[in-house]
UniProtKB/Swiss-Prot annotation:
The keyword NAD does not apply. This is GTPase Obg. GTP binds at residues 165-172, 190-194, 212-215, 280-283, 330-332. Its main location: cytoplasm. Monomer. GO terms for molecular function: GTP binding; GTPase activity; magnesium ion binding. The gene is obg.
């Protein structure tokens, strides 16, 4: 099950109490204090693991805590430190304060291990309180209390290319055609209910990761449809590929306008990312050339045919306000799919 948001309360361990103890041995009269210190409470860590892809392990858990430190003992023996709590999360997991929405830590790299909550310090045993005035102290410190906080974990997938389009425009068909991902594909809207990642191999030495998210509809940034819960998954993508359906009842210009507006409403940073446009399902389109021409006029672009591309910029004079390319494709017939992969790789290399 794909779970990308959970809320739970995390607590470190309470420090163990120091011991009140006196040396008791044969032939030792009035042995001095020998109470050991309490053990420190367990810490809380977040650990980033590439083999984990969801937050499902934490669904339904209201609270998790590390172990308390054990109390000190006689003979100046320190109590055992509490066992730490490690939360294994996938790359792209952000940890927020559930009350203030403050970002507390961001887990993005394989092997990253972040100390999140420190366990309470163990209390001092009565051995530490012996002095010239009081040779037999009968008190010790209690352990320090644990730290506790309610957090919200949000998973935002990390990919190179994010697919942006209305439902049923061919995003899942494309990612299954170019990568190892096998999303559910059917001829109805919202077939994709969870995000999918696919590794696209361009040649023997190059490739990139593509993310397919559920289709965007007008009002998605305000929570309509599957809304913001999935728009967040393209936040970390390096570039965006807008999928414009040439066989849709909406005009190409209407589709593009709504998609750009929803992305901009959701995040101005995301809206400023470099992007390209794929005109999909050209095998099923009518009046394709005429409709493409009208679309390009609507976004103030002059056609500059470059091979199979109806529009393509020169990377050396790149204008980020315009798409890098506009390419008609068909995932069903593999028309221009190789050209699409190489062009996306070119744009990604510009980002490096």
């Amino acid at each position: 099950m794909f779970i990308d948001s959970v809320k739970l309360t995390l607590s470190s361990g309470h420090g163990g109490a120091g011991a009140v103890s006196f040396r008791r041995e044969k032939h030792v009269i009035l042995g001095g204090p020998d109470g050991g210190d309490g053990g420190d409470g367990g810490d809380v860590y977040f650990v980033c693991d590439n083999n984990t892809h969801t937050l499902a392990n934490y669904k339904g858990k209201r609270a998790m805590r590390a172990s308390d430190g054990e109390a000190g003992m006689g003979r100046r023996m320190t109590g055992k430190k509490g066992e730490s709590l490690e939360l294994i999360v996938p790359p792209g997991t952000a940890v927020y304060d559930a009350q203030t929405n403050e970002l507390l830590c961001d887990m993005v790299e394989e092997g990253q291990r972040t100390l999140f909550l420190k366990g309470g310090k163990g209390g001092l045993g009565n051995f530490h309180f012996k002095n010239s005035i009081n040779q037999a102290p009968e008190y010790a410190q209690n352990g320090m209390p644990e730290e506790s906080i309610e957090v919200r974990l949000e998973l935002k997938l990390i990919a190179d290319v994010g697919l942006v389009g209305f439902p049923n425009v061919g995003k899942s068909t494309l990612i299954s055609a170019v990568s190892n991902a096998k999303p559910q594909i059917a001829n109805y809207e919202f077939t994709t209910l969870t995000p999918k990642l696919g590794l696209v191999e361009v040649d023997q030495f190059s490739g990139f990761v593509m993310a397919d998210i559920p289709g965007i509809i007008e009002g998605a940034s305000d929570g309509r449809g599957l809304g913001v819960q999935f728009l967040k998954h393209i936040e970390r993508n390096k570039i965006l590929l807008f999928m414009i359906d040439s066989a849709n009842y909406r005009s190409m210009s209407e589709q593009f306008s709504v998609l750009k507006e929803e992305v901009a409403k959701f995040s101005s940073v995301l809206a400023s990312r470099d992007y390209a446009i794929a005109i999909t399902r050209v095998d099923a389109a009518e009046n394709l050339d005429e409709n493409i021409s009208e679309f390009m006029k609507s976004i103030n672009l002059e056609p500059n045919q470059v091979g199979k591309f109806v529009y393509k910029q020169d990377l050396y004079s790149f204008d980020a306000k315009k798409p890098y390319f506009i390419l008609p494709i068909s995932s069903a017939t593999n028309e221009n799919i190789d050209e699409l992969k190489f062009a996306l790789l070119e744009l990604l290399k510009k980002e490096l």
